[in-house]
């Protein structure tokens, strides 16, 4: 078996509209929105009577996608938003941008916060945005 590509990364959100606005402001495109439910969805996730609203966001180059999910039933359970960066599990998604300062300025207006600081690393500027953003 050969992996063809990474299809998407899933993020569970409380407010799907706010998440769409945030990632649109970052530069991703909304590919589509849809409800997800039924026996097939229950089977894939292992959750009974699952109902989720999803939005698929695509990077401008078309090579990466984020699946934003808002659980209607069962409700979302664990809250990892304040977990430290060394906690187990999914904690970050990184994007390459043309202008880090301009991008951060736009995202700060949407409530984003830096976890640390903007630093220079191998001729690339990197920053961590707080996951509550």
Predicted segments — roles?
Residues 1-20, 29-32, 89-97:
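N-terminal beta-strand motif that seeds the catalytic metal site of vicinal oxygen chelate
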Residues 38-43, 75-81, 125:
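A short, acidic/glycine-rich surface segment
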Residues 19-25, 57, 107:
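Conserved active-site tyrosine of GNAT-family acetyltransferases
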Residues 26, 53, 64, 89-91:
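A generic structural signal for short beta-strands and their flanking turns/coil linkers
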Residues 70-74:
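Acetyl-CoA-dependent GNAT
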Residues 2, 11, 33-35, 56, ...:
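Vicinal oxygen chelate
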Residues 2-6, 36-66:
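C-terminal "cap" of GNAT-fold acetyltransferases
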Residues 49-50, 85-87:
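Short, low-complexity disordered segments enriched in Ser/Pro/Gly and basic
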